[in-house]
Amino acid sequence: MSKLETITIDTPSGSNTMQIGSTNTATINLGVSGDTINVPAGVTIANAGTATGFGGANTPAFEAFLSGSDQDIGDSVNTRVAFNSEAFDTDNAYDNSTNYRFTPQTAGKYYVYTLCVGFTTAGGYTDLAYMSPEIKKNGTRIAHAIFDLGSRQRQISPYVAIVVDMNGSSDYLDVFCEINANSGNGKLRNGADKTKFGAFRIIT
């Protein structure tokens, strides 16, 4: 194998297209480990093929859900939701046994969401009066939904989401919910497709 050493490769006068590799080429390597390949400002990279290995990963990421049994929510009491099972947790950043918090150790912007399926033990069609799930950061509410139902519902499934900055060390997220029942006590339904909480880092 021969080696070509030069400073600049350019097209001849009258041509504006350079072809590197032809019918015998299978792989073209640019640089070796530790090298930097600079793309100057104003240059356009036009891709008509398949690009792999670019971009970043949407991690840390997790999704947890309420499992085993429905969770009691005291009447008009803002209660932390105990999402006690994990669908996934890429960086072990979610506590599913004690504080039910997500504390990512990578700084950035995160998309955070929760789905809470609320109902009452009475089970009637007029027993659920009010429901408000909320996402908190470091103990302060940053997003919530309010459903003031009067006396018209048996079950409701509000979804709340927000994009939030996390410092990658001490910032944490958790979910609280308040339910008011005309009759019976408030509850959240368990199940991976019901009451859940998740987040992932956004590539910016």
Language-model segments: which ranges?
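Extracellular jelly-roll beta-sandwich "head" domains, especially the C-terminal globular C1q domain
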Residues: 54-204
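Intrinsic low-complexity, repeat-rich intrinsically disordered segments enriched
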Residues: 1-75
